[in-house]
Amino acid sequence: MQSRKGSLSIESENMFPIIKKWLYSDHDIFIRELVSNGCDAITKLKKLDIMGEYTLPDDYKPSIQVVVDTEGKSLSFTDTGLGMTEDEVDEYINQVAFSGATDFLEKYKDKANEEQIIGHFGLGFYSAFMVADRVTIDTLSWKEGATPVRWESEGGINFEMSEGDKKEIGTTITLYLSEDSLEFANEYRVREVLTKYCSFMPVEIFLSKEGAEQEYETIDKEELREDDVVVENIVEEAKTEERENENGEKEVVEVSPRKEKVKINKRPVSISTTTPLWMKHPNDCTDDEYKEFYRSVFNDYKEPLFWIHLNMDYPFNLKGILYFPKVNTEYDNLEGVIKLYNNQVFIADISRKLFQSS
């Protein structure tokens, strides 16, 4: 493909009401939007596999990798989704506010479950320019014979598009942060935002820091997985002690058996729990699971008084868990909080005051 430059086409009728309502209301929302885009891309690729239009490799692992580069003042998001062709970048990126998710649903509305497609407005990607002076996209489509594409824009107005060098199907979006947004070049700040918005997304999300020292862990050899990177094999010889038996005679007794262990590169831990408790049937949940979920979500280490598991399909689809906390004294805060998720993506904390009539 030939390298070319251009200006973005903005469908303002769709775009600007959305900007006024929410795009700039929360400075950290761009992370939620970019991760949601990656999740959508993975969901679409899986659906193409289900419909027989694509065959996923046997070792396919749906995931989103977020990498913080503190020295480079950048933040990248890499998904293993369906990627984009040059024409699709033109359609979904260069024409702002034309939603790829909406178009995908329209094409496959009779075959795909639209509830699992997160994007609706096509603006998620452009939230990146809330914090970045320059943004690049490196993408390779799932389509046979597709050419990798590299897209770059400064300020979200003009762009340059050329042939890329991405080898694996999927998309990497890299944000080169502006000076007033360098807080997002901090691993702990990004982890905080990912935990806030993406703890229950249906795809595993991994966070790492560019240039970080490799960490290791030691496990029993029988726990070794195919994807583990073995650094060292360790043998712990059996331990024995000399003890006196019931006859008063001394004998050597094995107190710890011989163990074979391996030192491996530390396994990454996903930030997201892909199947949150509210998605399960109430009959499949234990009291301990309900209590632990309450503690982790609401940061309240007192046990709830009781709870109601909501699982409605009519007149609308609603799943959730309504907890009633214990109130020990008259000084305890009685104001409730509802945590609202749409397709497992955190939307907002809703105070009880919002439901009170004026």
Where is each model-derived feature located?
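GHKL (Bergerat-fold) ATPase N-terminal catalytic module, capturing the glycine-rich phosphate-binding loop
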Residues: M1-E179, E183-F184, E192, S199, ...
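GHKL/Bergerat-fold ATPase module in large chromosome/replication-associated machines
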Residues: I117, V135-N158, S178-L182, Y188-S358
